[in-house]
Amino acid sequence: MQTRKTNDSGRPLRSLYLLYHELRPTPSEYSYVVQKAQFEEHLNLFASIRNSPHSELLPDITFDDGHISNFEYAAPLLQDRGIQAHFFITVGWTGHKPGYMDWPELRLLQQAGHRIGAHGWTHTLLTHCSSKDLQIELVDARKTLEDKLGVAITTMSLPGGRFNRQVLAACQEAGYAHIYTSIPKTESLPPGPMVGRLNIRGSMQADWVSSLFEPRSASLARLEREYRIKAAAKNVLGDRLYAKLWSLLNRAEPDAISGNPSDHENTAHH
């Protein structure tokens, strides 16, 4: 959490929320995988930015899905640098899906000072959900996290970044104060109810990531333009066709495929 509100020149500080998914010790063709050594370089960069009195834009780290690499690789590196992150958990996968964290790991992350938020129950796109499905993905997920961890859960990360008015209304009704999206943009301190994030890919090396934090960053402006183009493509193609195209272009692996709220029956009481 940030305590400063301005830099040494009196300029108001802003945050750039960064979205990670999975870390691996070796390279992967799946674009959402970041190498462990690469993540360490990112953290060294972020520590330097945070420690500079001249910085106007500060990094905030988030993880989606709850992959076990978040605990095995990311958590020790974060602890070494005194950096706290925000982990959004796909609740139905917890303790059930191979390669993803169980409740003991989540409790240890929480005890280390990291924040825990919800990322649905099955990772189904919320725009595809009925009212009953939204109850599972939003309310059941939040209540299960609260019961298992003993803390209030007030943050939700949208699977696939997809939302519409119905989804936002359901999130608010379910008790979430902050909704984290995949819209690449900077945020005020503290952020508003809709929080944008920049999706970090394996191709993004530390030198390029550094350019995002430059004043009037051309790299960040390009990502914002690309997001608007992709959003227009989603509107034309529809979610399902766009998701197939996304999987092909990003070399998505089976773990990246969304689930189905009917899976709730298999995991709800464990």
Regions found by a protein language model. Name each.
Residues 90-94, 182-187, 200-201:
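Short, acidic/turn-prone active-site loops that include or flank metal/cofactor-
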Residues 1-14, 196-270:
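Membrane-proximal basic amphipathic "stem/tether" segments
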Residues 14-30, 58-59, 67, 79-167, ...:
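Metal-dependent polysaccharide deacetylase catalytic core of the NodB/CE4 family, i.e.
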Residues 33-57, 146, 172-190, 239-270:
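C-terminal domain-boundary segment and adjacent tail
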Residues 9-13, 80, 187-189:
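Extracellular/periplasmic catalytic domains that process cell-envelope and extracellular macromolecules
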Residues 65-72, 77:
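Short acidic, Gly/Ser-rich segments with clustered Asp/Glu that frequently serve as metal-coordination loops
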Residues 1-47:
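Short glycine- and acidic-rich boundary segments immediately preceding or forming the N-terminal edge
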Residues 36-38, 42, 70-72, 130:
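Short, acidic/polar
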